[in-house]
A protein has these predicted regions:
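Extracellular glycan-recognition regions
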Residues: 1-93, 97-100, 114-119, 124-134, ...
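Short, surface-exposed beta-strand/strand-loop-strand elements in extracellular ectodomains
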Residues: 105-110
Length: 371
């Protein structure tokens, strides 16, 4: 609704895309507001598409910084999570103002092998003159690689000039995906000259004498652990030498969901899963304690035990943990057995991100899943 603002959307004029593509904020009266995003294109023809996109994560141009640019721009480490995840739904309303038929696809781009962008398209939607359509697309599996762009591709089988209006685009739903180190970096020692991502990683342990690609999947997580290593199949080797450390990712919109992970405890005093995280001082946690306790905790600028039960803990054992949130009811499962549940009746956290927590030691996990 802000005049002149394009909300971060940009025209992609790279490769063989249509160079005569322009976008602007325009007046458009509808049930939801008075503005829309207008995309004008000239000389659209077969094989030459008009594309526009918005960044949803670490911008691609940052991966191409030279050393001097890095020193100027990356004074602070990049901290942020993607805004789009596999399994979520994209909903959008598009109005064609073109006198010939056009075809429109939604697409995403994710960081894959070599930190290069890989593209996934939706099905094709045909628009005739002055046609309005509401379309939906479920984001496909990106194999644990972070999504960094969301966009539209406009095509035609014949030469045409015209415009479309995007009334809205909405991202909704809980992801259905597994977070882990992507398979293409199982052996992640690779020479690269594109950029030195080591300088962009905060709290991520990478040996100084080696240069790695494929660290962008870790940048999708916010963390305050002392070290995070990912050797072999272990995606999440989290070390906090003193006090509590976390890694988390996701969106503040996520409400009712479950998180699962098989976790091994190595001399940690406590560790487990985090749900509905709204920051380092606001979250729920399911934690196994070295004192033979299982807890559901609430961190609200101070740790509060919502429920505690006895639990026979063995160090260096793997435990399959599942933590569920359904409105204000919280349930904790160990090895698929419901062992603890509680209702938070006071100032409950209604939504938030997912993650892991470790206290005074190390925990290890191959992957974390949400659905």
């Amino acid at each position: 609704e802000m005049e002149t603002s394009t909300q971060g959307w940009m025209v992609d004029k790279s490769n063989d895309n249509n160079q005569n593509t322009f976008l602007k904020n325009c007046e458009h009266i509808s049930a939801i507001g008075k503005r829309a995003l207008e995309i004008n294109f000239n000389n659209l023809t077969k094989g030459i598409n008009s594309e526009l996109y918005v960044n949803t994560f670490f911008p691609e141009e940052f991966t191409r910084l030279n050393e001097q640019q890095e020193m100027m721009l990356m004074v602070y480490s990049f901290v942020g999570c993607p805004t789009v995840y596999s399994g979520q739904k994209i909903k959008t309303e598009i109005i064609s103002k073109t006198k010939k038929n056009i075809k429109i696809k939604l697409f995403i781009k994710y960081y894959g092998e070599g930190d290069k962008l890989f593209k996934l398209d939706s099905e094709e939607f045909l628009f005739s003159e002055n046609e309005t359509k509401k379309i939906e697309w479920t984001i496909p599996d990106t194999l644990s690689n972070p999504i960094t762009q969301l966009g539209y591709s406009i095509a035609s089988d014949e030469q045409v000039s015209g415009k479309i209006l995007i009334n809205y685009i909405d991202i909704s739903g809980i992801p259905k995906m597994t977070f882990k180190k992507p398979d293409h970096i199982k052996n992640d020692k690779v020479n690269t000259t594109s950029h030195n991502i080591k300088s962009l990683t905060n709290g991520v342990y990478i040996p100084d004498d080696e240069k790695y690609y494929g660290q962008l999947w870790k940048l999708a997580w916010v963390n305050d652990v002392d070290k995070w290593y990912s050797y072999g199949k272990n995606s999440f080797g989290l070390i906090k030498n003193a006090s509590r450390g976390h890694v988390f990712t996701g969106s503040s919109d996520w409400k009712n969901y479950s998180v699962t992970s098989k976790i091994m405890f190595r001399l940690a005093s406590s560790g487990g899963l985090v749900i509905r995280s709204q920051g380092l001082q606001r979250y729920y946690s399911l934690e196994i304690k070295s004192t033979n306790k299982l807890q559901i905790n609430k961190m609200e600028y101070g740790l509060k035990i919502l429920k505690e039960v006895d639990f026979s803990f063995e160090p260096f054992e793997e435990y399959f943990m599942r933590f569920e949130a359904d409105n204000n009811f919280l349930k904790g499962f160990i090895n698929n057995e419901l062992l603890i549940e509680v209702e938070d009746k006071s100032n409950q956290f209604e939504n938030g991100m997912i993650g892991c927590i470790v206290e005074n030691g190390t925990i290890i996990s191959d992957e974390i899943s949400i659905n």
